[in-house]
């Protein structure tokens, strides 16, 4: 397969279509920053996929529960090892994503002889001061983005943009306003 690059590209394209189909029934995850902290919210009919990872890190996800659990456990272990070996202040969302989870997800996606992770992740990092919160979204192919005031995971990029556009129009300061805007 590696001798024929066009087949590899075709296989990667097929994986994208397959994974896009897997997220169509998923419940969106919304992360919004407010004056008292960060809200992660989902309206899942099943088990909510929201977790605490470390002191100032939380995780929200969409996808297959087993894949999310494996990625959550890897993040949890990585954060605690980093905090123990270095310093708790070294455990940041950016560090966990850039040097830990994103390369692993990317490798699983591009290794065509193995199953990819059926997961999208939103990592929220509570800032040391109000207004310094960060969100990182990781797609099923390992690509990630850093955002500041809010972030959304959903079935498609169009839905995410629509939800972000709605959140931009809201005046959000208190937790009550955040919950109202997120619902």
Predicted regions and their residues:
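Long, low-complexity N-terminal extensions
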Residues: 1-183
């Amino acid at each position: 397969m590696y001798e024929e690059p066009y087949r590899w590209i075709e296989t990667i394209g097929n994986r994208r279509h397959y994974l896009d189909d897997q997220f169509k029934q998923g419940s969106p995850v919304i992360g919004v920053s407010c004056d008292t902290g960060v809200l992660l919210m989902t309206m899942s009919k099943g088990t909510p996929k929201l977790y605490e990872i470390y002191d100032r890190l939380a995780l929200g996800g969409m996808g297959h529960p087993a894949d999310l659990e494996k990625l959550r456990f890897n993040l949890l272990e990585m954060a605690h090892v980093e905090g123990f070996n270095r310093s708790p202040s070294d455990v940041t969302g950016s560090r966990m994503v850039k040097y830990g989870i994103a390369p692993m997800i990317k490798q699983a996606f591009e290794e065509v002889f193995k199953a990819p992770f059926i997961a999208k992740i939103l990592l929220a990092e509570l800032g040391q001061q109000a207004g310094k919160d960060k969100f990182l979204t990781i797609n099923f192919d390992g690509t990630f983005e850093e955002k500041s005031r809010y972030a959304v995971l959903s079935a498609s990029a169009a839905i995410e943009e629509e939800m972000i556009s709605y959140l931009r129009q809201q005046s959000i300061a208190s937790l009550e306003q955040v919950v109202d805007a997120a619902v």
